[in-house]
Amino acid sequence: MSSYFVNSFSGRYPNGPDYQLLNYGTSSSAMNASYRDSGTMHSGSYGYNYNGMDLSVNRSTSTGHFGAVGDNSRVFQSPAPETRFRQPSSCSLASPEPLPCSNSESLGPKGSSPPSDQSTTTAGNNLNSNTHFTEIDEASASSETEEASHRANNSAPRTQQKQETTATSTTSATSDGQAPQIFPWMRKLHISHDMTGPDGKRARTAYTRYQTLELEKEFHFNRYLTRRRRIEIAHALCLSERQIKIWFQNRRMKWKKDNKLKSMSLATAGSAFQP
């Protein structure tokens, strides 16, 4: 082996002769001889025995590092049993008893009553607890019935209130459905809401100075409006799209008429200056 492993092993376990290293080149007899017998070792100085388990190193005489399965008697039992750390426990894994260990009596408190007395006392305690639970159950059942009746009495006016609220909500919904939705451009504050004149015809739309100025500005840049721009102007000026469309149609007709008159006047003026 390497010197590093040897040094670490000797540093970890100061008793070097007690823990001889395993030589893999020798035979099985030599390997068995290289270990110390577990009977000659002191369990108090090399390991602690808790619940019968041997926690020391190299206690078995088998070839394995932790010991073979067949040598459990030498591995798990110490020749010098210590009553301070463990009790002699002999547990049978195949027995169906609830407490198979032989030292089950040591688990309970010392100086207690016999098992028959314990069983009678536990039965009496269980009987008392059962009667107490039945009393509690009866009291809780009576309280639950009272609460249920109280809830039923309270639920009746609540249902009536809910029915009234639903009826009022339905009536309000029907009234809202009958009334049309009002948009800002539908509110014509500058004109009368009755759109009929004295002779039964539609009244002429009266535009304010602000509305006329904004429409003239828009017509100066664009003589034809897109639907998007028309909706924007309608919301800004509190007018309807139809009103803006009609205004632009009338303004285009006026512009054509003015240009026609201007062109005619220019033509007549030009013809007048001809020789």
From Swiss-Prot:
GO terms for molecular function: DNA-binding transcription factor activity, RNA polymerase II-specific; RNA polymerase II cis-regulatory region sequence-specific DNA binding. Residues 113-133, 151-164 have a biased composition (Polar residues). Gene3D superfamilies: Homeodomain-like (1.10.10.60). Residues 165-175 have a biased composition (Low complexity). It is found in: Nucleus. One of its GO terms (cellular component) is nucleus. Signal peptide: none annotated. GO terms for biological process: anterior/posterior pattern specification; brain development; cell fate specification; regulation of transcription by RNA polymerase II. Pfam families: Homeodomain. Disulfide bonds: none annotated. Keywords: Developmental protein, DNA-binding, Homeobox, Nucleus, Transcription, Transcription regulation. Residues 200-259 bind DNA. Residues 70-181 are annotated as: Disordered. It comes from the Eukaryota. A motif (Antp-type hexapeptide) lies at residues 182-187. Belongs to the Antp homeobox family. Sequence-specific transcription factor which is part of a developmental regulatory system that provides cells with specific positional identities on the anterior-posterior axis. This is Homeobox protein Hox-B5a.
